[in-house]
Regions:
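Class I SAM-dependent methyltransferase Rossmann-like catalytic core
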Residues: 1-52
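Class I SAM-dependent methyltransferase SAM/SAH-binding core
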Residues: 58-101
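A short acidic, Gly/Pro-enriched loop at the edge of an enzyme's catalytic core
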Residues: 100-112
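A short SAM/SAH-binding and catalytic strip from SAM-dependent methyltransferases
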Residues: 110-123
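Conserved beta-strand signature within the Rossmann-like core of class I S-adenosyl-L-methionine
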Residues: 137-147
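Short alpha-helix
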Residues: 155-178, 193
Length: 200
């Protein structure tokens, strides 16, 4: 089952999501740990280096990246064009964008990464936007919270990975890999399931 919070207006949803990232105390804390958290993200991608290495010269985007540690981690692994996206931009490596209405051209992106599927108010639209933007044989790496309670900013609950997989198939994706997350660190302990989707 995929459950979604009832929010009357899309503008209210946007305001809710920006609230966390624009909080000055949180931003100060995140900025202070930027280098430390970047290093913690490296094993997340390194475990699939044999799958992702072919995208090192492609456009790569980390969606809902806040301060963009995941994009910096990918840059350190040789993905020179990796950037984060968020409703609130940050420095030079996180650009402003909306996951439900992405600015990228059709079939232009090699790889997407995201761990904020639970922050999507319209999961089918989110997946459809990723599918639209990916090149043929492009990949989308999702880290999911399965069966976890929502925090204040989460709007979507996933009870079973099969629910996500079925929705992804409906959009047109092929399931490249689906497995329990084996690389758990203090910053990603709630992300208990990894799925890699492919556009064919």
């Amino acid at each position: 089952m995929i459950g979604i919070k009832k929010i009357k207006k899309y503008e209210d949803y946007i305001t809710l999501q920006k609230e966390k990232t624009e909080d000055p105390e949180r931003r100060k804390k995140w900025e202070g740990k930027l280098n430390e958290n970047t290093q913690k993200f490296i094993p997340t991608f390194d475990q699939y280096c044999n799958i992702f290495d072919s995208f090192k010269d492609s456009l790569v985007y980390c969606l809902g990246a806040r301060t963009g540690e995941e994009a910096l981690a990918l840059q350190s692994l040789g993905f020179s064009k990796a950037l984060g996206t968020d409703l609130v931009p940050f420095l030079d490596h996180v650009i402003e964008d909306d996951i439900h209405n992405m600015q990228f051209k059709d079939s232009s992106v090699g790889l997407f990464y995201t761990n904020i599927f639970d922050h999507s108010i319209d999961p089918k639209k989110f997946l459809s936007e990723i599918f639209r933007c990916l090149k043929p044989e492009g990949k989308a790496f999702f880290q999911l919270q399965i069966g976890s309670q929502l925090d204040k900013y989460g709007v979507l609950f996933i009870d079973n990975p099969e629910d996500f997989i079925n929705l992804a198939k409906d959009v047109g994706f092929t399931i490249f890999k689906s497995e329990q997350n084996k690389v758990l660190t203090p910053h990603n302990h709630g992300l208990n399931w990894n799925v890699i989707l492919e556009k064919r």
